Amino acid sequence: MHVFGLIGYPLNYTLSPQIHNYVFKRLRIDAAYVPLRVASKRLLHFIEFSRDALSGFNVTIPHKVAVAKLIDELNDDADTIKSVNTVVNSNQKLIGYNTDYVAVEESLIERGYKGEEALLIGAGGAARAVVLALSKTGCRAIKVLNRSRERAVELCGLANGLGLDCSVVDIGGNYGKPHVIINATPLSSEEYWLLNLGELGTMLLLDMAYKPNTETDLIKRARELGIQVIDGVEILVRQALAADKLWLGDFNEPSASEVIKYIKGINPS
């Protein structure tokens, strides 16, 4: 039996086990997926433990950048952004990948995104994946909004290296008229209004955050304004299916829409 897991902290809630275990059952694969609460001080210990105990694992907040420094090898995309959300155990050799960017890229392309200006909220591991996805979809310019300006400047360095025209914008500053807004933070309900969505002329909003039984306030506000939305559940499902392919090889996977429908059906709002 294959055992896979998700590491993060504090990992208060996650839909990942429901997604992966549904796929395993649907495909009649002898495997299980479990959440594993791992604090930063125990991360190195977990990495060594996983070599014998797990066939692979996913990584979430706050470990995506740290894990990239601790495992044996990174594929080209993960190495470019130094952020890992999926680890494959290949005969005790831990190889890191990033499927977050795959999920973002797929969802943007499906909505007809063609590289228009973007506003990115956040500068952590998830934001690094967004920058890579935007570069692959032909994005020309992005602005980065983050509480820590230093981290935003660092992220812009990565973006510039990928050929994007990147600038940092302060909270309450000039956000411009971004075609797409992407939230790559666990933005709280008290903060979403800082964006003044109604004044930005945004056509598409992608929120990587999600809640188990309801939409985030950012998604709700965007819907009220008639803005097309991509929610965090869709991103979670798409990155999970990409991770399963890395772990299990090519298989006749269920569609993202099928899995999204299942997950939202068992977690009604």
From Swiss-Prot:
Catalytic positions?
64 (proton acceptor)
Keywords in UniProt for this one? Amino-acid biosynthesis, Aromatic amino acid biosynthesis, NADP, Oxidoreductase
State the pathway, as annotated in the record: Metabolic intermediate biosynthesis; chorismate biosynthesis; chorismate from D-erythrose 4-phosphate and phosphoenolpyruvate: step 4/7
The gene from which this protein is expressed is aroE
Has keyword Amino-acid biosynthesis?
A: yes
CDD domains recorded for this chain? NAD_bind_Shikimate_DH (cd01065)
What species was this sequence derived from?
Answer: Caldivirga maquilingensis (strain ATCC 700844 / DSM 13496 / JCM 10307 / IC-167)
The residues that the entry says bind shikimate are 14-16, 60, 85, 100, 210
Instruction: Provide the assembly information.
Output: Homodimer.
Q: Which residues bind NADP(+)?
A: 76, 122-126, 208, 232
Name of the protein: Shikimate dehydrogenase (NADP(+))
* Catalysed reactions listed for this entry: shikimate + NADP(+) = 3-dehydroshikimate + NADPH + H(+)
The family database entries (Gene3D superfamilies) matched by this protein are listed as: Leucine Dehydrogenase, chain A, domain 1, NAD(P)-binding Rossmann-like Domain
As recorded in UniProt, its EC number(s) are 1.1.1.25
UniProt record similarity statement: Belongs to the shikimate dehydrogenase family.
For the biological process aspect of GO, one term held by this record is: chorismate biosynthetic process
What this protein is reported to do is described as: Involved in the biosynthesis of the chorismate, which leads to the biosynthesis of aromatic amino acids. Catalyzes the reversible NADPH linked reduction of 3-dehydroshikimate (DHSA) to yield shikimate (SA).
Give this protein's Gene Ontology molecular function annotations.
shikimate 3-dehydrogenase (NADP+) activity
